[in-house]
Amino acid sequence: MPTNELGVELGLTTGSRWSWPDVQSFWSEAEEMGFDSLWMSDHIMTEGYTTESGRPEPTSPDVPPPLVPMLECWTLLAGVASRTSRVMTGTIVSPVTFRHPSMLAKQALSLDQMTGGRFTLGLGAGYTEREHAAFGLPYPPAGERVTMLEEQLEIMRLLETGDYASFKSEYYSLDQAPCVPKPVNGHIPVMIGGTRPRMMRLCAKYADHYNVAGSPNYVRERFADLEAACEKIGRDPSQIKRSVGLFIAPVDPLSSLDRALHVIESFREAGCDEVIFGVRQDHMPVIEELARRLA
């Protein structure tokens, strides 16, 4: 539960386009200032942003994507997360299409050990087709990607529990994979981002943390969907932490302290337990002012 005057926890997200020196410095300062969580987005190229959704817009195959330096999320995250001592860390979110579930699970278990149990595994079905095409990564239809995500979540659960994991499906197979080390706290928290009915069912079954992007009204509606999905399987929805991910488009939520405080209050009223801001380095003055409210 938040202990600050704002009534919600506050997290910050840095992207893979940050340089190694800059992300080290920022994460160190943000932890010292008292923010509750620090996250890394998982992309390998940028496509610009729309003015409507804040998500990368499709880039025509005939137009090369922008030449923006991007570091790999998990490598960068391992470097900075292991240097923290208090703050929760995580991915927001890793698409199922980038890595085999067994390798992703091993990466997550490694970060869990490196942070002393302060890692949340954020997962999603992926949505940037041009990014996949650019790097030769398969991008199946949405329904298949959600099925792959469900299998990934089941594999993660298997690797956390028994001594060996075996699994066989249309997409993945494991054959007596050794399940060591175990998570520091017995379980790595899983964040799921998504809004469609099947994704909500996966959240209800597997998630410890649900993250969504959108307006306060939209977020409130998705939380109601989550509660309905939980009710269908007999799960208490209060077991799932609820957060909103706020990015720079269409309106920069960190353009001023007043703007940031208004945004935080709006999403607190919508039912959020945590507000997670996407940040740039030039946001630091507002971030420092926000930090004073966390004391």
Where are these regions (language model features)?
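Active-site-adjacent structural elements that line small-molecule/cofactor binding pockets in enzymes
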Residues: 1-295
